[in-house]
Amino acid sequence: MKMTTEEAFVKTLQMHGIDNAFGIIGSAFMPISDLFPKAGITFWDCAHEGSGGMMADGYTRASGKMSMMIAQNGPGITNFVTAVKTAYWNHTPLLLITPQAANRTIGQGGFQETEQMALFKDMVAYQEEVRDPVRIAEVLNRVIMNAKRLSAPAQINIPRDVWTQVVDIELPVPVEFERPAGGADAIAEAAKLLSEAKFPVILNGAGVVIGGAIPASMALAERLDAPVCVGYQHNDAFPGSHRLFAGPLGYNGSKAAMELISKADVVLALGTRLNPFSTLPGYGLDYWPKQAKIIQVDINPNRIGLTKKVTIGIVADAKKAAESILAKLSPNAGNAGRDERKNLISTTKSRWAQELSSMDHEDDDPGTTWNQRARASKPDWMSPRMAWRAIQSALPKNAIISSDIGNNCAIGNAYPTFEEGRKYLAPGLFGPCGYGLPSIIGAKIACRDVPVVGFAGDGAFGIAVTELTAIGRKEWPPITIVVFRNYQWGAEKRNSTLWYNDNFVGTELDPEVSYADLAKACGLQGVKARTQDELRDALAKAVEDQMKHGKTTLIEAMINQELGEPFRRDAMKKPVEVAGISASDMRPQLLA
């Protein structure tokens, strides 16, 4: 069938139902963007490509539907780097479209030219370049299928002179693969271990959310009366109200989860790669059960046993593996110590809930006094934990929330719980700043009838602040964003107090800047909240305005400068002076 290359490209997108694109317009892909309105594809023209990529990540994580990111070759595409790597470690299937300089000029160092395939080589699960216009639909179809199968971004690189050619082409037919269920022997061995366990624990990861495995993991947990922990930043991987939910592991997570998993003799790590950062000690507890037998279920065989010693590895979809293991359990599975285990789960959770509700402030390490000084300098201001408690009291139960990297969002890791998956959009283990705002925008585009609230510290928010200039237009849906305002890069400042004698280099932000006023200047609502009551009421009104009146609100939550536990206590140490450094050794540069 004869058609243009751009028609073949867009028809392939339509076959896969990919109807949302995020980026900034550029001449290198105008032949296809010209067809987007006719094709039913919405192009979301953000203020910066990096934020556009994170919008795409938020859209797909909230909805489960693939979206695409696209921009001008060269500098437009390089702006996607952080977003693509973020999506890679969030296991988000995305289509990365990278228009390229024309074939006839590649290699000449021409306008907006760079090696785009090499750039993303370690950031995507699959990449391919269109070598022949006749193959454009075939290549695009294969790239999309690999993104789906590998649950990660995949890249198609398209020299711009491929467009506007008439080709005789047969559109490909998408071939869906059944996700693996795990080997029969491995499933049987896992069921045997869990049947004989005296203190089984289930650890749910991102694969449980992505694979829709929460009901299957719940059935397995209830059969065994096993506590269920969730991985770092995966608070939505099990219902928060369930009696067996112990909470998140990792940085500022649930002490109850840490205490319970430390007692495990068998751990079922379901849909998780067991990232080492997710199991670092917390609250002084080195809780990972080193003597326990570990069953790791992951759809990617390369990640099984990569970070932890594993007894049984199962290459499988989390839902299918959980269902198969449940079916193979012995009649007496879970009976050993069942009553004692149930009581311990209940008392441990209750004790932690009481402790968490009473935690108002951050502790100082011996020999340091920053948090004490921070409280004294602003005695009437909220602490980060006070702010998080106020937020929890006003947050709708069905809300989708996002968070950012940084001190104040991380302090809140133990607080939010959810009743279903695809509700918590944390930045993930690549750890980019500037994720909270764009990801929640993407989530709202995907889920118009659901309230959404994004969170960010003021340092991280500054990286994505330009999106305020984009989202006030009438076609953009309303959102709510809370910015924790304490005028500092908090995580780095905590490092400075612990290891660098309060030598604060690059940690201070401008107190004269008001994000609330900036939001107003962009035609949005901007509010400052100075107390818990003000924050609770402002959030409740902002959500109401979002859902009933179509208004976007930015809330500046004014908090004191308390600093939480350092992110990388495991990787930092106090410097030692040997040769010494003096400003007198600085020499003037010799200019050409």
Regions found by a protein language model. Give the residues of each.
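Hydrophobic, well-ordered secondary-structure segments
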Residues: S278, G282-L285, I325-K342, T347-A353, ...
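Generic recognition of flexible, low-complexity loop/linker segments
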Residues: I144, E189-A191, K255-A257, Y283, ...
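Active-site nucleophile and cofactor-binding loops and adjacent substrate-binding regions
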Residues: I24-G26, W44-M54, M69-G76, R131-D132, ...
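Active-site diphosphate/adenylate-binding microenvironment
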Residues: E6-F9, Q14, I24-S27, I32-P37, ...
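Phosphate/pyrophosphate-binding active-site segments
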Residues: T5, V134, N157, E170, ...
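Thiamine diphosphate
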Residues: I97, T105-G107, F111-Q112, I261, ...
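A general structural motif
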Residues: K2, H48, Q108-G110, F177-A191, ...
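N-terminal alpha/beta PP-like core and its mobile active-site loop of ThDP/TPP-dependent enzymes
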Residues: M1-N332, T369-W370, A394, W476-I481, ...
